[in-house]
Design a protein with these regions (language model features):
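Conserved aromatic-histidine-acidic binding/catalytic patches
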Residues: 72, 76-87, 106, 110-117, ...
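Terminal targeting/low-complexity segments that flank the catalytic cores of oxidoreductases
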Residues: 1-109, 131-163, 167
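Alpha-helical transition-metal enzyme core signature, strongest for iron centers
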Residues: 84-92, 114-129, 148-152, 170-181, ...
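Inter-helical turn/loop segments and adjacent helix faces that build the functional surface
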Residues: 97-109, 133, 182-201, 214
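Internal, hydrophobic cores of structured domains that mediate oligomerization or house catalytic pockets
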Residues: 162-169, 176-180, 186-187
């Protein structure tokens, strides 16, 4: 496989094709998803229409990238979305091998469900990048599939650490996913409406991850 510029997707369908290649490379069998459907979900009502905090409080939330007032703010949005998506795919790379040694059938089901939902969350972030941020977004969406936790080049250090044992997984879902819940909660108030609207469904799914570690 060439570098990410050789596989830069121009459409969402092309990105999905590259995503399927990522699944093959990391050894995630799509059949493990069962009847779980990878999809893009929004809760527009929960996102609200009005900016809640900061210098732009009280104004209409931004629905397109060009409505964001400054390039530095658009760059910050791309960074936040990219980091969130990067963690989702990284966690699958860290955890995938554990399915072969699950202590119980339920543990295997729980881990497979968590990995399915993490892939959906990664999809969601890639969709935002592909749909709203032009060529820069397409580049970042592709790079989500190029970095790999096993190579130690995911963006956040915690998502490059090996997870050799199920106790690691349980601690991960107890603490790292708990931190992730608060991160999603903060993003749910984003002034960029598509990002805020992405968080409602993600938070609902994240609650199962926390329950697994509790």
């Amino acid at each position: 496989m060439g570098g990410y510029m050789d596989n830069l997707p121009n459409t969402w369908e092309e990105w999905i094709s590259n995503f399927e290649g990522w699944q093959q490379r990391v050894g995630f069998d799509p059949s493990w998803l069962g009847d779980f459907e990878l999809s893009v979900l929004f809760d527009w009502e929960r996102a609200g229409d009005v900016i809640e905090f900061g210098d732009y409080k009280g104004r209409a939330k931004w629905e397109r990238a060009l409505q964001v007032p400054h390039q530095s703010m658009r760059d910050a949005l791309i960074t936040m979305i990219t980091v969130q998506g990067d963690t989702e795919f990284a966690s699958v790379e860290q955890q995938r091998h554990l399915l072969a040694s699950a202590p119980t059938d339920y543990d295997r089901y729980a881990a497979a469900r968590i990995m399915a939902e993490e892939q959906r969350h990664g999809w969601q972030m890639a969709y935002l990048l592909m749909t709203y941020f032009g060529q820069q977004g397409r580049r970042e969406a592709q790079k989500l599939l190029e970095r790999n936790a096993q190579d130690g080049d995911r963006l956040l250090g915690a998502f490059n650490i090996p997870m050799p044992h199920w106790l690691d997984f349980f601690c991960y879902t107890m603490f790292v996913d708990r931190d992730g819940k608060f991160q999603l909660g903060m993003l749910s108030t984003s002034a960029f409406k598509p990002l805020a609207a992405s968080m409602g469904p993600m938070l609902k799914e994240e609650s199962f991850h926390l329950g697994t570690g509790s």
